[in-house]
């Protein structure tokens, strides 16, 4: 995580991050579903199991997991507010392919918005040549590497919650478990389990 203590306006042109795992490492990557507008999607896709050196060059959203042998590393974010989420791209260059590097990518800041009346939804019509703006001092998102020796430790890892900003809505006792829409999707990526999924 990084932070700024400037008093005025800050324009963030870009952020650079590259994570080297090794080309033969296996990863689980959820790719964008709209390659022509990769940042405009619903974040709904299955996880593709792939070696890093044969992974698609499409952008993948988080969380993403890499099997490093004795442990798995899941890349996550926390405390993400007024800043674009991090995406990952494999094989951006031959050097990245040889070293098994996942490189960060960020959506550009919207310049002009438009509206789909039939869906009651706005969308980005054009973008700026930077990724974010900010005023005054602030913290930026945490980049998290959750390291687990066993898959069963993944859902119990609470780093995202531990690093998040405190609750801003107050009393949450009114939030109750309930029914969910699209329930037929619940067995999409449960594989290799000893029970019938869904």
Predicted regions, residues:
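Structural preference for beta-strand elements that scaffold enzyme active sites
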Residues: 139-143, 177-183
């Amino acid at each position: 995580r990084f932070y700024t203590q400037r008093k005025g306006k800050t324009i963030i042109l870009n952020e650079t991050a590259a994570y080297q795992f090794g080309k033969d490492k296996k990863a689980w990557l959820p790719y964008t579903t709209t390659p022509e507008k990769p940042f405009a999607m619903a974040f709904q896709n299955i996880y593709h199991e792939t070696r890093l050196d044969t992974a698609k060059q499409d952008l993948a959203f988080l969380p993403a997991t890499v099997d490093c042998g004795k442990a798995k590393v899941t890349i996550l974010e926390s405390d993400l507010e007024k800043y674009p989420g991090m995406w990952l791209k494999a094989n951006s260059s031959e050097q990245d392919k040889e070293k098994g590097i996942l490189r960060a990518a960020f959506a550009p800041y919207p310049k002009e918005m438009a509206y789909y009346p039939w869906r009651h939804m706005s969308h980005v019509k054009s973008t700026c040549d930077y990724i974010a703006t900010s005023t005054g001092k602030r913290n930026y998102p945490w980049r998290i590497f959750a390291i687990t020796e066993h898959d069963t430790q993944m859902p119990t890892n609470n780093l995202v919650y531990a690093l998040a900003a405190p609750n801003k809505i107050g009393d949450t006792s009114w939030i109750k478990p309930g029914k969910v829409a699209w329930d037929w999707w619940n067995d999409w990526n449960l594989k290799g389990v000893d029970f019938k999924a869904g």
